[in-house]
């Protein structure tokens, strides 16, 4: 009887039965997530509560951060953006999740789904868990201290000299008559920053400024970042991540692997001179003392990849908002040109004393944070209170950088570029400045913030001391760019005129 019954069942029947069971299971799971899950009382769209699909859709679309910001405008300072995930924008939540020096059992650890290990089980400082992070931070901190960065000023100034010379050449009508003095500034910011970072990491620059073009290794960095974003999105769909991974373009994967291979070769060469004295210490000089080769590889790779593009993004957005806000442009150029009578006076110590320059950079990072996404964490196993509400253990939590820094809850005229808000202007005294934390806070804040500030201040000050910049009709508002962990890159064409100095 049983044999006869089985013989009457076709393969199609089996597939239909299994499909029906699969659909039923996931419908039940979705219903549980919406109506019975411990996070059910938190506000947010029902579809986001039901499954990861809506979140992943916006990640792949390149507007996840803007989507999250829209949700916060609608639902408030905390939003449920996934079945087991909450997004916050309040400074108090930021302090709870990232601030202080909590004991190990109170730590909001990195979300292992969002921060995939780049090299097996080897940790880099960005992905590392509590104990590994403390160890790596101690090894790396001396390389990024204010003292260490001051010792690298000659390197930063030297490459800035090259940048200024190249732009001066291209601003002239005779050398490039077809361009009419219009230059896409984005590649040039990449050239100088990746030259600086590779010089400080490998001992030698990658030579972008020399060739006035992207080195192949740099050109694939942006694809490598998108590859990582797609991979992270795929892992949100576990156990079905293989489906999405199947659609990641092969050339993107190949570029990512080529990027890693070149990094390893450069570090292998640097390690061969480990015992030889160098003219000026670089990052590797510090990190070679206590890291394994694999740890060195992972950490140098993340420093270059994350540090170059984010710093370039802030300088370019500063220039964009300056040329589109004449009063701010005039005030900053006046501050720089009135302070310095000769370009050689523009030192790291001197630019640190320019209040409006610092305010411009702070405002650029507020209105266009270089890392717009929230930094993903997991609530302690025992749970925690965030903004007075109980969050169950192992809940995914984050603070949405873009949403927080543009929220009318914390800022007056949040869409307006106004550096004066950082200088005590009474009109903006209601602003909650802590809502903008582009370098994060606490013991896991950005280790490279001193170097980033040095690069941004020196490069921007010297550009505005040497040149006058004019906006072009095809300029794209940085807020309109897509984001894949960091912002995509699009041309920023500016007309550059060599400054006419008067005595």
Swiss-Prot record:
The chain crosses the membrane at residues 14-34. Gene3D superfamilies: Cytochrome P450. It holds the Pfam family p450. GO terms for cellular component: membrane. Glycans are attached at residues 94, 169. GO terms for molecular function: heme binding; iron ion binding; monooxygenase activity; oxidoreductase activity, acting on paired donors, with incorporation or reduction of molecular oxygen. It is a single-pass membrane protein. The keyword Oxidoreductase applies. One of its GO terms (biological process) is biosynthetic process. It is found in: Membrane. Keywords: Glycoprotein, Heme, Iron, Membrane, Metal-binding, Monooxygenase, Oxidoreductase, Transmembrane, Transmembrane helix. InterPro entries: Cyt_P450, Cyt_P450_CS, Cyt_P450_E_grp-I, Cyt_P450_sf, Cytochrome_P450_monoxygenase. It comes from the Eukaryota. Its EC number is 1.-.-.-. The keyword Iron applies. Heme binds at residue 446. Coiled coil: none annotated. Its main location: membrane. Belongs to the cytochrome P450 family. PANTHER family: CYTOCHROME P450, CYTOCHROME P450 MONOOXYGENASE ASQL-RELATED. Cytochrome P450 monooxygenase; part of the lnb gene cluster that mediates the biosynthesis of diastereomeric piperazines. Lna and lnb clusters encode sets of enzymes that produce overlapping sets of previously undescribed metabolites such as piperazinomycin-like metabolites or morpholine. The lna and lnb biosynthetic pathways appear to be part of a signaling network that controls the formation of sclerotia, a resilient overwintering structure. One primary function of the non-canonical nonribosomal peptide synthetases lnaA and lnbA consists in the reduction of L-tyrosine. This is Cytochrome P450 monooxygenase lnbC. It comes from Aspergillus flavus (strain ATCC 200026 / FGSC A1120 / IAM 13836 / NRRL 3357 / JCM 12722 / SRRC 167). The lineage of its organism: Eukaryota, Fungi, Dikarya, Ascomycota, Pezizomycotina.
């Amino acid at each position: 009887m049983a044999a006869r019954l089985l013989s009457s069942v076709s393969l199609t029947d089996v597939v239909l039965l299994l499909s029906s069971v699969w659909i039923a299971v996931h419908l039940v799971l979705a219903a549980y997530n919406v109506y019975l899950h411990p996070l059910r009382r938190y506000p947010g769209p029902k579809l986001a509560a039901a499954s990861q699909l809506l979140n992943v859709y916006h990640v792949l679309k390149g507007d996840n951060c803007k989507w999250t910001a829209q949700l916060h405008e609608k639902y408030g300072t905390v939003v449920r953006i996934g079945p087991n995930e909450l997004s916050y924008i309040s400074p108090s939540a930021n302090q709870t999740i990232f601030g202080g020096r909590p004991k190990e059992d109170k730590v909001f650890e990195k979300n292992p789904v969002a921060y995939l290990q780049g090299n097996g089980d080897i940790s880099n400082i960005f992905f590392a868990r509590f104990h590994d992070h403390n160890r790596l931070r101690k090894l790396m901190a001396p390389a990024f201290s204010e003292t260490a960065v001051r010792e690298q000023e000659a390197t930063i100034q030297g490459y800035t000299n090259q940048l200024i010379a190249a732009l001066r050449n291209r601003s002239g009508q005779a050398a490039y008559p077809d361009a009419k003095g219009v230059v896409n500034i984005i590649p040039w910011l990449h050239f100088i920053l990746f030259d600086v970072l590779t010089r400080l990491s490998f001992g030698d620059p990658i030579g972008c400024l020399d060739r006035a073009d992207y080195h192949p290794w740099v050109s694939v960095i942006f694809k490598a970042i998108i590859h990582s974003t797609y991979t992270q999105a795929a892992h949100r769909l576990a156990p079905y991540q293989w489906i999405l991974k199947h659609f990641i373009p092969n050339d993107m994967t190949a570029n990512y692997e080529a990027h890693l291979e070149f990094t390893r070769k450069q570090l292998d060469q640097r390690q061969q001179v480990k015992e030889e004295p160098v003219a000026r210490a670089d990052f590797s000089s510090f990190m070679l003392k206590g890291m394994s080769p694999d740890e060195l590889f992972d950490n140098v790779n993340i420093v270059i990849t994350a540090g170059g593009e984010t710093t370039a993004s802030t300088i370019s957005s500063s220039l964009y908002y300056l040329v589109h806000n004449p009063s701010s442009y005039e005030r900053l150029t006046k501050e720089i040109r009135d302070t310095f009578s000769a370009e050689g006076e523009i030192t790291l110590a001197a630019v640190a004393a320019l209040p409006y320059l610092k305010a411009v950079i702070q405002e650029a990072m507020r209105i266009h944070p270089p890392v717009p996404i929230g930094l993903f964490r997991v609530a302690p196993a025992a749970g925690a209170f965030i903004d007075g509400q109980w969050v169950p253990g192992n809940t995914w939590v984050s603070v949405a950088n873009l949403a927080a820094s543009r929220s009318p809850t914390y800022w007056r005229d949040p869409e307006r570029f106004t550096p004066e808000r950082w200088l005590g202007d009474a009109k903006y005294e209601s602003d909650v400045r802590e809502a903008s934390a582009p370098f994060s806070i606490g013991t896991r804040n950005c280790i490279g913030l001193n170097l980033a500030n040095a690069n941004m201040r020196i490069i921007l000050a010297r550009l505005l001391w040497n040149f006058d910049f004019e906006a072009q009709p095809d300029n794209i508002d940085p807020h309109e760019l897509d984001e894949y962990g960091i912002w995509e890159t699009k041309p920023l064409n500016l007309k550059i005129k060599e400054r006419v100095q008067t005595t």
